Regions:
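Hydrophobic alpha-helical bundle segments that form small-molecule/ligand-binding pockets
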Residues: 89-100
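Acidic/histidine-enriched, glycine/proline-rich intrinsically disordered or flexible terminal extensions
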Residues: 155-178
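Residues at helix-coil transition
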Residues: 25-26, 51, 94, 120, ...
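Residue-level signal for nonpolar/aromatic packing positions in well-ordered secondary structure
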Residues: 3, 20, 89, 108, ...
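GST superfamily/GST-like fold recognition
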Residues: 56-61, 99-128, 134-140, 145, ...
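GST-like domain detector, emphasizing the conserved glutathione-binding G-site
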Residues: 1-76, 80-83, 97
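Alpha-helical packing segments of well-folded alpha/beta enzyme cores
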Residues: 78-86, 114, 141
Length: 178
């Protein structure tokens, strides 16, 4: 993804999800703690997602859900990695409401579409295969985030499939989502 911030002169170009999240959090002073420990913890998890998600999407998701031929070795290999990543998240969320601690941050925004939606069985139809029910803390976190009004609205942006009530194929103003 890419963003061009025309609210400044000269316009600033920003690309890649993590960079966009960090840029917007700094620009608007939200979703990124200001204290060094909280900020660092948030960035740790943001960058964890940047490094981990390709194994989930490009590895597990591809071989489990999309590959034209189901090959045992890559499915087993990437399943093991997906479960390891879910375990890392589950351990973190056992003692924390959100990834960086008590507050919802850009780390949660980055991680939830991949791992939260995975355990909710909304990507790859793999929750049962991965025994997602065993990751109870990830499940709790995923459900809490799914109920956030901004998340509910955000999932409708540029959506062209599913129930018509859940679609906003083109967005021009914030009121388009209300």
């Amino acid at each position: 993804p890419a963003l061009l911030d025309r609210s400044v002169e000269p316009p600033i170009r920003v690309f890649e999800s993590g960079s966009i999240l960090l840029y917007l959090a700094e620009k608007f002073g939200a979703l990124l703690p200001k204290d060094p420990a909280g900020r660092t913890e948030t960035l740790n998890w943001l960058f964890w997602q940047m490094g981990s998600a390709p194994y989930l999407g490009g590895g597990f998701g591809h071989f489990y859900a999309y590959a034209p031929e189901k090959l045992e070795y890559p499915i087993n290999r990437f399943t093991m990695e997906a479960k390891r990543q879910l375990d890392v998240l589950n351990r973190r969320l056992a003692d924390n409401a959100y990834l960086a601690g008590d507050d919802y941050t850009i780390a949660d925004i980055a991680v939830w579409p991949w791992y939260g939606q995975l355990v909710r069985n909304n990507v790859y139809s793999a929750a049962e295969f991965l025994a997602a029910h065993e990751y109870t803390h990830v499940q709790r976190w995923a459900e809490e985030i799914a109920k956030r009004p901004a998340v509910i609205r955000g999932q409708r942006v540029n959506r062209t499939w599913g129930d018509e009530d859940s679609q906003v194929p083109e967005r021009h103003e914030a009121k388009d989502l209300d």
